[in-house]
């Protein structure tokens, strides 16, 4: 069920996700974790929206429900939803877990076009987040929000500019995170070039 939902793209496949959630698939047992997984697969593909998320949260009032709800809101494929998630990640006082789930929801490769506008914003707020948030929140933000959704020479150049200029005096831990993320993107670009 997870593999199917995670790769569903056609209207019929997306309708099947809704059918799974509705309990009409014989022999499929859906626990809370699988329900959220299937639901979020639908959210990130535009099948379900904010009202549906509210309904799911009403069904699952546990701590896990709140975490998955935060992820679901960040998975909504719209510029407005991504902007709200980015703002929450970088400015709100979220718990470590809610913050992590929001980051993971925000940064989804299905939403590359929507997320392209957030590359510069990431590098603009990085130092402030590092200086004003606790270590775990700052480290999670630096790592999970690194703009891996736009694998390009331009993103590598922006990371290098941050290392050379904006973040030249940043903490060793933050610089290491950006260096490692930049290097991973350089390797990805080389792999792409080799495949062509």
For every predicted segment, state its role.
Residues 1-196:
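Long, ordered, helix-rich scaffold segments
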